[in-house]
Structure formats: C-alpha cells, structure tokens
C-alpha cells in the first residue's frame, strides 16, 4: 500500500511529496501550497482532455481496422484508402506555408550540427557520463573499439599495443589533414605545434614550418604559446583540441608529442524518462526526478568502483583557454540536456486526483521535470544547462496536431504554475507515429513558438506502421522493412517538411539510433548517411559512439547540405501511405521459423531484464549473439510483427509458443554470467517475464496502437509485489 499525503486536494505518494518539499522546491521562489494548488488545477483541467485524445486514437484505429477488414490484401485501392483517411480525420488538409518563430534557443540546437546521446535518467552513472560526453578522446574511441581492425598485429590486448596505437595516430593525422588542412604539407609526421603571434606554426617532417590553410580555425590554447598543452580549433561549427604532452606514454611515441585529439562529441543529450527506462511507480519516478534535479543543479554525483578503486564521478566544469587575442575563452564543458517526458498514454499512481483516479503520467512529468529545471535557470548556477533561459522537453508518441496542441497547452499551464515566462518550455516533437508523419506540417505549426526539434524514430514508427494496418494483411519480413517505399519517404519527408517550416538555424532536424554499440567500424561507414540526409543531429548509444559519429559532421557540412535539399521536395504523402504488405506469402517453413525465432528471442531477451531487473535499455544479444541496443521501441516492432503474422495465419499459436519456449534457454545462456539473473526456463507457467513476453504477442492486436507499456507496467508491478 502506497503511503500518501494530501496536498492541494491531491493524494500524493509520500516519496514524491517528500522529494518535492525537501529537494525540488528549496532554492526556488515557489510556495509549497501554491505549487500543489497549481498542480491540482492543471490536473483537473487537462486530465479529461488527455483522456479524450486517447479515445480519439481508439476510435480512429477501430475505423481503420474495419476498412481493412473490407479491403484486405496487397492490391487495395490506394485512392479509396486515402479518401477514407481524409473522411475519418486521420489525414488532414495541409496548412498554408509558415515559418516557426521559436526564440531563446541555445546554439547547440540552432547552429551546431553534431551527435545526440540518449540515456536512461534512472541510471545516475550513465547520466553523468552522458553529460560529460560533450568532449571525447578520439584516441580512446579508436583504440578501444573495432573502428581500428585487430589485424596485422593490431590487437587490443591487455596492455598498450604500439602497433595498434600507431594505427590510431595515423587515423587521427588523416582526420587533421581533412578537418584542419595546412597551407602546405600534411599533419602526418609533424614534429611540433606552437602558437606564434596568434597563428599556428607547424613543423613538418622535413623541418620546414607552415601555418593553417584557414588561419581562422585557430581559436585558442592552454599552456604557453611556445609550449601549449592543448590547441583549440573549430571546423564545421564543432571544436576540437590537439593535446600535447611529450612526457606522456602516447606523446613519447609521437614526433610532435601529441597525446590525443579531443573532439566535441555529444553536443546535446536526451535524458530519458520514456522508452529506455522501467518506471512503474512513485519510487521509480522519484529516482528519475532526483537524478534530473541533480543534473539541473549541477551537483549530481555517483560513487564508481573501477579496478579495485572507488572514486566520485561528477559533472565536468566548463573548458577555458587563452584565445588568440589574449583574452579568456570559455566553452561549455557539458552536453546541452533535453529531458524526454513520457507520452499521453499511461497514468501513474504517484498521484491520485480528487476522485481517486490515477493521473496522466505525461502531466506529472511536465510538472516535475520543469520544477527541477528551475534550478538550472538560477544566475548563480555555474554548471547551468541553458544559457538562454530555456528548458528543453522531448515529447514522444503524439498522434497528430491536436495532441501536439495539447502538449503546448500543458506546457503553458506548467509555466503559469512555476512563474516562468511564456514559451520557456521548448518541445522536441518525435515524428514516430504514422498520424503525426502524414500531418507533420500541422504538428509543427501547433507548436510553432516552442518547437526545437523534430526527429524521426523509425523503430517506433515501424511498430505503428504494423499496428495501424494490422487488418490489411501480413507485412514483409522485419529485415525487409527498411527497404520498403514508405520508410525512405518518411525519412525524407521529415527533413523536407522541417526545412520548409524554417527549422534551419532555429531547431534540430534529427535522425534515429545506431543500435549496434559494439559495431563502430560499421557505424563509421554507414551513419554518415544521416548528416548527408540533412539531419543536423542523430542518435548514438554511448559517449564513444558520439565521438566517432562526430567525425561525420566534419566530413559533411550539414547546413550546406540542407540548402541543397530545400531546393526540391523529395517525398510525398502518397508514398508514406504505402502499406508494407508482403506481395507474396510463399515463405519456406525455414524462413518463417527463422523469423519467428529471431523475434521471440529479441522479445524475451529484452523483457526479462525489464520485468526482473527494472532495466529499460540495455545491450541484448540477438540470436547470433550480436549485441543490440534494445528499448521499448524495438520491443514494439518485434511483438507487433509476430502478432501480425499470427493474425493472418502465417504462423500458428502453437508455433509461437514453441518458439518462445525454445528461445528461453538461449536467453538464459546469454545471461548466465549475471548472478542476479533468474532463468526463464523451465517454469514457463509461473515466470512473470515469460508471461509478459507471451502477452505482448498474443494480446498484440488489442494493445492501444501496439504499445508495450500497459503490459510491461502491469507485469513489472506484479513482479515487484511478489518479490517485495
């Protein structure tokens, strides 16, 4: 039973009430009684609107299901389908051209193209590491990953391997030649870097000296001009340092004493309360709110044990240099932080309203993450987040412009409660639901004074694609989905629409996650496609990945690329509406079994950690033991995919259950090294995680928009109650 406190007519879980009273309110000018009264007013006015929007979702989905029931199959009438979507209010008329007018936005969002980290806010260590990932060692990122192949004697080994180190140095010198070209010659083989009369002087391998091709790239240095310890440069809006220490282990092996190249990496980071966390009750929510408060105050710390030693990890201070004109130059030492609130779907028992009903969780997140954010806006906060007085909130899983307008209304009401100027709360719009995609222009317009990013989330978007057209027929195999017409159109349409609405120079246009955190060589080859596509940010799973992905923004001038793209529209709504139905279902039994096993294993591997450990995002080995970054979005695809094939008789219930039971020992083996892990097999009837995985598939067609949260939350609460 949850202990509760009466506040403002609300029944507030004591753990949340105490957090607000003892931690979040102190240091602000807010009065406790006024805050709770304001929160109660917001809940009373907006919870019914939230509920009504969810009813519209269900009503529309019901009509779509019925239409497909009468027009099933791959040869459906495209024109009739589009007309039907307009008739039911799914596809709206496109608004007249407009430009967003968001103001007070930090340059990390408006004019800097670079990587964006996403991390679960419930994990303080991850959160601090992500905040500090604004700057990253290129040498470490190359040496410690498969970005440099372990061939020709270049194995990582257990101690420093000079062969590998030399390959790292060579890679870095090639980067310098590209991002920091000299007036003549190459960075390869250089023997010295000094600052002389506000210019860079580089000694080449032959003893001659040269400067920079573009002297304006030099911004400053640390140390002394004739013996700098770090030299700061800028290229394509991103900063980087050449770090020099001839006495260091690496510097000793380098002709110029260079020990590292430090790259500006995770320019922005999303601290996530949504798909990457498992927060099902007041205790979980308060853990996240407390970590977010620490990030906003700049005092979040974590005790870390490594190599038998314990130390305190804290947030980095800003970086200072002597600029070329002799004045002090300061750069932000931390990633600019967004917070991702949950969507409109779920309710939380952290607060019960005056009638004893659970409150929409998204309303709670808006109130309490913004309350915590007040602390980052105080003038005496030396580790403040925004320098323009804004709070940045990502809002996921919205369906169409009415839901975006509701978010804007909610943010306005929260500003009133907290005494903030109008439009302090900025919104990042996740374009990850089909009804938002096809009405994206109207969605942006609904938040035209608040929008600071639009982002394609192809994982959730695929889940919604499958669920929306569940009754239309069997979809293509999961691996073939990326080759379908709709997904390329969706990605291009997002950029086209954002540029036409004036997001360039005012907001981010983002792309999705690289989900294979151990495959950095592949990421270096492939993820350059995101900046080439006109995205001025894209998601990465780790600080190391952020450093390596930053290289792509040195290779591609994103803002120049956006100007090229803006000349012509590349995608149409008609292409987006192409349903990814399989043209033929003559798959072999082996192909069907392989598809079933892959998805069953993926579901079990993720769900067992969610239910048993409360871990919402982790590296989960796939059926081939390749580690994939899984969260609720990947779970949504896998569960909806099997539900679709089951619905249309491609596989049977018996086959699905057999696959789950056969894959359970595979997942158990993959987790065998974890002493806290409880095996899924063989007690399938009593194992709550196994039951949750089964529910997600067998109840998949009836879950709201194919979301996984209702089942996960219910089963996680059940697990916590049994193991209390």
From Swiss-Prot:
It holds the Pfam family MS_C. Transmembrane segments: none annotated. One of its GO terms (molecular function) is malate synthase activity. GO terms for biological process: glyoxylate catabolic process; glyoxylate cycle; tricarboxylic acid cycle. The modification Cysteine sulfenic acid (-SOH) is found at residue 617. Its cofactor is Mg(2+). Acetyl-CoA binds at residues 118, 125-126, 276, 313, 541. It comes from the Bacteria. Its main location: cytoplasm. Pathway: Carbohydrate metabolism; glyoxylate cycle; (S)-malate from isocitrate: step 2/2. It catalyses: glyoxylate + acetyl-CoA + H2O = (S)-malate + CoA + H(+). Glyoxylate binds at residues 340, 432, 457-460. Mg(2+) binds at residues 432, 460. Its EC number is 2.3.3.9. InterPro entries: Malate_synth_C_sf, Malate_synth_sf, Malate_synthase_TIM, Malate_synthG, MS_C, MS_N, MS_N_TIM-barrel_dom, MSG_insertion. Monomer. NCBIfam families: malate_syn_G, PRK02999.1. This is Malate synthase G. It comes from Rhodococcoides fascians (Rhodococcus fascians). The lineage of its organism: Bacteria, Bacillati, Actinomycetota, Actinomycetes, Mycobacteriales. The gene is glcB.
């Amino acid at each position: 039973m949850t202990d509760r406190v009466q506040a403002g007519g609300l029944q507030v879980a004591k753990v949340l009430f105490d957090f607000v009273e003892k931690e979040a309110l102190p240091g602000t000018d807010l009065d406790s009684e006024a805050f709770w009264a304001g929160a109660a007013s917001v809940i009373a006015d907006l919870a019914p609107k939230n509920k009504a929007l969810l009813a519209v979702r269900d009503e529309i989905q019901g009509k779509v299901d019925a239409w497909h029931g009468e027009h099933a199959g791959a040869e459906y009438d495209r024109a009739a389908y589009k007309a039907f979507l307009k008739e039911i209010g799914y596809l709206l008329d496109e608004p007249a051209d407009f430009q967003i007018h968001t103001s007070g936005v930090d340059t990390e969002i408006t004019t800097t193209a670079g990587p964006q980290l996403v991390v679960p806010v419930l994990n303080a260590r991850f959160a601090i590491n992500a905040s500090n990932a604004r700057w990253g060692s290129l040498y470490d990122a190359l040496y410690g990953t498969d970005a440099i192949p372990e061939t020709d004697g270049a194995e990582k080994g257990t101690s420093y391997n000079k062969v590998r180190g030399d390959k790292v140095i060579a890679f870095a010198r090639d980067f310098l030649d590209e991002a920091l070209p000299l007036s003549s010659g190459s960075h390869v083989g250089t023997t010295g870097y000094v600052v002389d009369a506000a210019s860079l002087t580089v000694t080449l391998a032959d003893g001659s000296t040269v400067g920079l091709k573009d002297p304006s790239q030099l911004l400053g240095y640390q140390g002394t001009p004739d013996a700098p310890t770090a030299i700061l440069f800028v290229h394509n809006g991103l900063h980087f340092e050449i770090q020099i220490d001839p006495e260091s282990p690496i510097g000793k092996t380098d002709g110029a004493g260079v020990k590292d190249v430090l790259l500006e990496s995770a320019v922005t980071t999303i601290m996530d309360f949504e798909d990457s966390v498992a927060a099902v009750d007041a205790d979980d929510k308060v853990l996240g709110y407390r970590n977010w408060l620490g990030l906003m105050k700049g005092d979040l710390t974590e005790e870390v044990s490594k190599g038998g030693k314990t130390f305190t990890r804290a947030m980095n201070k800003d970086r200072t240099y002597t600029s070329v004109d002799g004045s002090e130059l300061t750069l932000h030492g931390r990633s600019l932080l967004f917070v991702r609130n949950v969507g409109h779907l779920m309710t939380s028992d952290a607060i019960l309203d005056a009638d004893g009903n659970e409150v929409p969780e998204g309303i709670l997140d808006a109130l309490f993450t913004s309350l915590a954010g007040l602390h980052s806006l105080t003038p005496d906060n030396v580790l403040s987040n925004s320098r323009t007085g804004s709070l940045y909130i990502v809002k996921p899983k919205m369906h169409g412009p009415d839901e975006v307008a509701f978010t804007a209304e909610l943010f306005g009401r929260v500003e009133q409660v907290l005494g903030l100027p109008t439009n302090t709360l900025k919104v990042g719009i996740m374009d990850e639901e089909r009804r938002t995609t096809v009405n994206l222009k109207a969605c942006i317009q609904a938040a035209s004074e608040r929008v600071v990013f639009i982002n394609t989330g192809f994982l959730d978007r695929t889940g919604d694609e499958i669920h929306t057209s569940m009754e239309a027929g069997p979809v293509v195999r999961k691996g073939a989905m990326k080759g379908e017409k709709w997904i390329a159109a969706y990605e291009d349409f997002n950029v086209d629409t954002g540029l036409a609405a004036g997001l360039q120079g005012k907001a981010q246009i983002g792309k999705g996650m690289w989900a294979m955190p151990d495959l950095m060589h592949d990421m270096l080859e492939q993820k350059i496609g995101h900046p080439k596509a006109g995205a001025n940010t894209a998601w990465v799973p780790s600080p190391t990945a952020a450093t390596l992905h930053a290289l792509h923004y040195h290779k591609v001038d994103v803002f120049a690329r956006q100007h090229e793209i803006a000349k012509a529209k590349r995608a149409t709504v008609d292409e987006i509406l192409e349903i990814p139905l399989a043209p033929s279902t003559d798959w072999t039994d082996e192909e069907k079994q392989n598809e079933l096993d892959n998805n069953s294993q993926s579901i079990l591997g993720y769900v067992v950690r969610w239910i048993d450990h409360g871990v919402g995002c982790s590296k989960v080995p796939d059926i081939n033991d390749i580690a994939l970054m899984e969260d609720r979005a990947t779970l949504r695809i896998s569960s909806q995919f099997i539900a679709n094939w089951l619905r249309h008789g491609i596989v049977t219930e018996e086959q699905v259950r057999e696959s789950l039971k056969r894959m359970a020992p595979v997942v158990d083996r993959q987790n065998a090294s974890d002493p806290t892990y409880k095996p899924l097999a063989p007690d399938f009837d009593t194992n709550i995680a196994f039951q949750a995985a089964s529910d997600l598939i067998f109840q998949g067609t009836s879950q709201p928009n194919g979301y996984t949260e209702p089942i996960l939350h219910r089963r996680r609460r059940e697990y916590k109650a049994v193991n209390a």
